Amino acid sequence: MSFKMTQSQYTSLYGPTVGDSVRLGDTNLFARVERDYATYGDEAAFGGGKSIRDGMAQNPNVTRDDKQVADLVITNAMIIDYDKIVKADIGVKNGYIMKIGKAGNPDIMDNVDIIIGATTDIISAEGKIVTAGGIDTHVHFINPEQSQVALESGITTHIGGGTGASEGTKATTVTPGPWHLHRMLLAAESLPLNIGFTGKGQAVNHTALVEQIHAGAIGLKVHEDWGATPSALDHALQVADDYDVQIALHADTLNEAGFMEETMAAVKDRVLHMYHTEGAGGGHAPDLIKSAAYANILPSSTNPTLPYTVNTIDEHLDMVMITHHLNASIPEDIAFADSRIRKETIAAEDVLQDMGVFSMVSSDSQAMGRVGEVITRTWQVAHRMKEQRGLLDGDSEYNDNNRIKRYIAKYTINPAITHGISDYVGSIDEGKLADIILWEPAFFGVKPDVIVKGGLINAAINGDANGSIPTSEPLKYRKMYGQLGGNLQSTSMTFVSTTAYENDIGKLLGLKRKLRPVHNIRKLSKKDMKNNNATPDLDVDPQTYEVFVDGEKITSEPATELPLTQRYFLF
């Protein structure tokens, strides 16, 4: 005998279903469920009197040897990803996403492709949003505490360079040479994130570059503070082509060795990741932003200029001075810093992100960026652009799915593709590492509820350890068992070059983490950037710094207020 309930009753029990819209935090963005994998009436739910009990949604006969039996099931999750906004159960096995589908007991339930057995644990995601762990590809490894801060914001992968609080690291994402790379690969064993390091890309002698790739670097960073000359860039790209690694470029702000055109002539048609493409973070003044129009440039923003607000310009001068070891008593140093801060290009940056011309967002951690705000600032830009520019094509009232898919791609799948790790991380897809973030919708983009890393809970909001229930105050982020003992290594990956992987660098250094080789990088182009691959004609007026897209001036007004801000940080 069937039982009918209202949609609001259903939603209160099992979360939203097809046609329901969910507001993201206190933004103006609404995600609408496109598909529900559930078989209505056969939902898997855990708790007293619920369906996941022996002989009901839990199969009493199966063992873990059955390939369909999950170690962990996340039930009734609303998944937001670059290519889907769906409701489903997520099966995890051996630390990897096994299946997205319908969980339960196939002996008594229809359409089950994830089996719950005696060996299965449950995380209830009814009414919650699930996303892939974020990827920050512009990290200065200045302070190891960055990792925990980033993790608690929903980031699970860091790519960049550094050796600690050295002047070189404070200014550049470089881990220079085999000795430093080996030391940092050993240090990564104690970090709760997936990690990849970039070496120093300045050397005419290819041996000095190649030895860093052999030592485990997943790419090379060419940075103006070490000399971003056309020659250095050309040699770095030659090595990158030989070893299938990425080049990250912080171009020449001072235009000493050439202008933007000379840099692009040196690049030719070879792919590279252009850091902070707007230019406030560094790069050819005033027109680095034009590089985003090239088919071989994968452009990203760093988060201090996102979104453009009434405070953005004022805070940037001091940030540039400190980060790049400049002296306020030297007029040329002041001029250097001042040349990078242009309100016109900053005002255009948000619009270029919204148009899908800029493909990624990253932090620039402690080097003009905030490591724990990549996700928050991405969604603030999305909110602000909807406020100023209206709905994107294909979106409608209470349905911002196209904009949401565009923006989530900026810190998940696109950075993964750019650095050759998209086979392992970057989306909620079968076969990928189970780096999964659960959010209460009201806190989406600001404070995750649970962080699953490699299939095990790594951190979560939890109460006093002496409390009688897990919600006893003070509620705060606490490390979980995924960060203890050998789990710290077994739940995360260290990314290395293919040549380092093939030469067993893990054995050489005694590494215990999962090592994975980066690959499929050198054939990339902008068209590989999901939902963010526009290549319009871009121009910058050299006198006024105004930005034009296909001949039309683009700009935005500075925000005076934003969502996802003070109300979330009262305590």
From Swiss-Prot:
InterPro entries documented for this protein: Amidohydro-rel, Metal-dep_hydrolase_composite, Metal_Hydrolase, Urease_alpha_N_dom, Urease_alpha_subunit, Urease_AS, Urease_asu, Urease_asu_c
Domain Urease per the UniProt entry, residue ranges: 133-571
UniProt PTM comment: Carboxylation allows a single lysine to coordinate two nickel ions.
Gene Ontology biological process: urea catabolic process
UniProt binding sites for substrate: H223
Record: residues binding Ni(2+) 2: K221, H250, H276
Modified sites of kind N6-carboxylysine: K221
Cofactors: Ni cation
Assembly information from the UniProt record: Heterotrimer of UreA (gamma), UreB (beta) and UreC (alpha) subunits. Three heterotrimers associate to form the active enzyme.
Name recorded for this polypeptide: Urease subunit alpha
